[in-house]
Amino acid sequence: MLTLLSLPPAVALVSGFGLALVLAYIFTGLIGRLARRKGWLDQPSERRVHKVAVPRLGGVAIFLAFLISVLLIYWPGSLHEALVYEGFLPAAVFITAVMAYDDVRGLPPGIKLGLQTVAVVILMLPGLAAGHLNEHGDIISSIHNPLHIANIINSDTLEIPLIFAIPFTWFWTVGMMNTINFVDGLDGLAGGITMITAVVMTVISVLLGQYAVAVLCAIFAGSVLGFLPHNWTPAKIFMGDSGSMFLGLALAVLANIGGAKLATMLLLLGIPVLDVAVVIIQRVRGGRGAFHYDKRHLHHKLLESGYSQRQIVLMFYGLTSFFGLLAILSLVLPDALPFVFRTSIAGASLAHLIGLALVGLAMIFILSFLIRRRRPNKDQPVLTTSQPHRESNL
């Protein structure tokens, strides 16, 4: 277990969260002012919907707050967590730095995908180097078996051969980074969803007795929460790709470091993941690139239907919180939940997963109903967001 510099777990958790929150709030304000002086702004144009120039480097502030808090609060003690630590921090430094350059200068989508791949390679290197010790660090080499209770495969854990674990880790990590990137379409949306997810992961880690992982999740939650006041509509600063890519990378790692949380992460981010998957399929079927800019995402459609930014963001906050509560209650009161909600963090039956998928589809149906039910006021502009995607936002 991580040695938290002799701090009691509760003290480390609270102090880590508080330190990260304060640092992120201060750094975001400072970086916003620096970006304005240097002219590192997202300028309004016909292809954008915001009306004033806004800095896009908020992700750098989030990362710096996280990094400083992590270095001050804990140190890895076990081999697994040391390998994760050795891979995650360099990968986070790399992806934040290169995407900060993208926020300032701009990079084509192919280059950005290549840089994401480099970040994943950095993430996996310590685990690859220690493979002879049967310890793969950030490489996802096993998953909990959802078919165990159905007696399809009689094992709680499915071991993934390294030849498949490497591409699976790439797909999971790059997919998570781009999911958060695509969700970053309204002020406060990506940051708030990520913060709620991190808080839920903190609670679950505490319930599972994984206090070191809980501290890491709490620091991450505090870093994002400290940024949110600056990003709430109307935003004074955008997180940019430096922020969305770091947030996605961190979520991908946090789901793996504690073990048994990949399914939980998919539950919490089920709506954004389904939304991104559907939009990408529609783009590809329409002969466009997967990362071609359009307004097919749920938050775009809700915006065009007349809902305000705040209403839409709060809808997504509510959905994320709802699924987070289900995940927590499945540990605290598993027998009190309806059958389809009893999703064990240590492994769920196929029926449970199907039930949860149906719940997710029901949420999509509700959002679709809201889109059809309300129509925009003709006297008001339809698009009010100040955080647009770029045409090739990856």
Each model region followed by its residue ranges:
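Cytosolic, membrane-interface loops and tails of multi-pass inner-membrane proteins
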Residues: G29-V54, V278-R310
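Small-residue-rich transmembrane alpha-helices that serve as helix-helix interface/gating elements
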Residues: A346-L367
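"…together with the soluble PPM/PP2C metallo-phosphatase catalytic core" -> "…together
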Residues: L2-V276
